[in-house]
């Protein structure tokens, strides 16, 4: 009751059961919305997918990051999510002081290069925005015709993610 919305930070690389296949697999591509929908189901509050990304060149090419962002942004939209925010706007590789120089993994995640030119992921976001604007920003809410009952055990996330992926096939 203290919050209007909840948030998730769904990185496939750090999520159990989501990283068993390539980032661009069905499981990898559905992970963000699956986590957010599970959060909504448990809390009864809308969920914002914030701080999502691919971890940049550490995990994949700029083109794969762009495709991942596009699929997930569309998925967030069609599944009625509150929003979808990429991490982050700018590269941090030119910031040679703490905390930015502590972890090489976190330095090249931006939508813009250090010179502020667009990376392919920024172009994907523009395409998604233009498509949504052209189609109209609202779509019918999906009907829920099944639920996943959680027992509260250590493998709940495995069951949630597996059930969500199966429901989309």
Descriptions of predicted regions:
Residues 1-59, 91, 130:
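Glycoside hydrolase catalytic-domain groove-lining segments
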Residues 40-169:
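Carbohydrate-binding surfaces of carbohydrate-active enzymes
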């Amino acid at each position: 009751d203290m919050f209007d919305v909840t948030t998730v930070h769904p990185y496939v690389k750090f999520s159990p059961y989501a990283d068993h296949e390539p980032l661009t697999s069905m499981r990898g591509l559905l992970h963000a919305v699956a986590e957010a929908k599970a959060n909504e189901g448990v809390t009864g509050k809308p969920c914002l997918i914030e701080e999502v990304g691919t971890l940049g060149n550490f995990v994949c090419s700029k083109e794969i990051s762009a495709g991942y962002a596009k699929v997930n942004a569309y998925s967030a939209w069609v599944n009625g999510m509150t929003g979808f925010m990429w991490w982050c706007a700018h590269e941090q590789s030119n910031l040679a002081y703490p905390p930015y120089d502590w972890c090489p993994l976190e330095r090249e995640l931006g939508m813009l290069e250090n010179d502020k030119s667009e990376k392919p992921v920024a172009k994907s976001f523009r395409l998604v925005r233009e498509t949504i604007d052209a189609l109209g920003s609202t779509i019918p809410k999906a009907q829920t015709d099944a639920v996943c009952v959680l027992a509260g055990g250590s493998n709940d996330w495995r069951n949630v993610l597996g059930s969500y992926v199966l429901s989309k096939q």
